[in-house]
């Protein structure tokens, strides 16, 4: 293969305030599961930089769970589709697909022999279904709740018991198979968010929005006690997870804490305070082997440290909203990837290890649309919050003084030499020097969309929605129209100069990439055809002979300058999502980002 996937830096879980997030464990103890958008993410628990992404759902995926055998995963989405797929092959072949009810699936449970599945959620006619995994034949009827069911679990030892937790403040207890309703447990005074049997099946825990955790006998359903007396947490409890030996319980709450409970002593052994911001609310947890994980409303996954509750062992960060732009900094022999997302977050990633963090302080408040680096260790970004920001790559801290307010919304930014920056806004081109606006062109007869600056000559190329590239030159503190336009094949979406400044590549809405030769007075060198939909982004390889383009057709092409017919086609680089930005780490490594909030690296080999 001329290309192969080298690394995946996965997205964080997609979070919603007041809604529990299920982190599902792996019976073999190696991985954990969660969902974001239409994707199911499988991450290695020892090294979270190792990730695999399943993207076959047509609607937003909500929950995924391993079968106890470890060979299959069942995942459910907002439309009520349940897909059961293989975990042993990279292709993740579909085994079975069912539609237990029409509506969002909120939780899934398997019997220990991996033969029966219970599915619960927000159905229209019914809220739950339990059936054989291979035929879909019913193995009972789940009744006893009159509102949306949030959680389900099946005792992993015989005789089987099934329990559900619902918005009607009740848990329903069923025996089977075939599963039949026995009684309701109505101890909670608010919604029941989570129900879980202990690994040996002897105990059952239920957690609710009333801040209480009740323990029951796993076989009979008799109430044993209320953990912590009247209240286990000051806020609603969204998840509980048992220790492997069943003696302790981990709970996650909206009061921004997680707790470890000694079940026999009925007391909290450890309390983890995870912050004071609303984004620090804890909406999910998982206890797997020696690892204790919790997930915050921000999407961050915390590895909790029993020996030091005040500070997590590590926090997995990243994006959980679509990534809009990216740039790469190669210095000191290391590559750092900078990414900006739809919610205003900017992250920096070590390209080798995947270690990443976000800039500190108060930054952009809306989508980061474009970014570029200057030679002074600064990242220049423009955003839909109508600002342009200069952020130090050394301090990695936003500073209020480094923000420049624009008159109208900026779309794209380019950095030249000598402290010059050009940004194109709606109906306006602005020149900045040393972090100050020095010149603007307002009376344009076209709508500017993209900009690039020739580092050597200072020529500014502005791509317009009129299907032309307009050339300007920086003269002192002003921009002079050169009176020259270059014809693209459609409305320009992106443009980039090669690193040696010899060529200008232009992508357009008519699916074409056009390359102009700078030395020959910007004469057209070649046109490159292949995209089936609007081309979006273009990036030059450091060898100046190859360049990559991405489009709305979800394709990435790597083109050869001297031969338009020699191309490498990369379909489904980010399946179901178009690639929003590209950048080369070196001559053979291409990085891509997309609306799936993931960063991928590809090894590209040329003949």
Swiss-Prot record:
Belongs to the WD repeat AIP1 family. Pfam families: WD40. One of its GO terms (biological process) is actin filament fragmentation. CDD domains: WD40 (cd00200). Induces disassembly of actin filaments in conjunction with ADF/cofilin family proteins. Doesn't sever actin filaments alone, but caps the barbed ends of filaments severed by cofilin, which blocks annealing and depolymerization and allows more extensive severing by cofilin. InterPro entries: G-protein_beta_WD-40_rep, N2O_reductase_N, WD40/YVTN_repeat-like_dom_sf, WD40_repeat_CS, WD40_repeat_dom_sf, WD40_rpt. The keyword Ubl conjugation does not apply. It is found in: Cell membrane; Cytoplasm, Cytoskeleton; Nucleus. WD repeats lie at residues 4-45, 48-87, 93-135, 138-176, 180-218, 224-263, 270-306, 311-351, 358-408, 432-474, 480-518, 523-561, 566-604. This is WD repeat-containing protein 1-A. One of its GO terms (cellular component) is cortical actin cytoskeleton. Its main location: membrane. Keywords: Actin-binding, Cell membrane, Cytoplasm, Cytoskeleton, Membrane, Nucleus, Repeat, WD repeat. GO terms for molecular function: actin binding; actin filament binding.
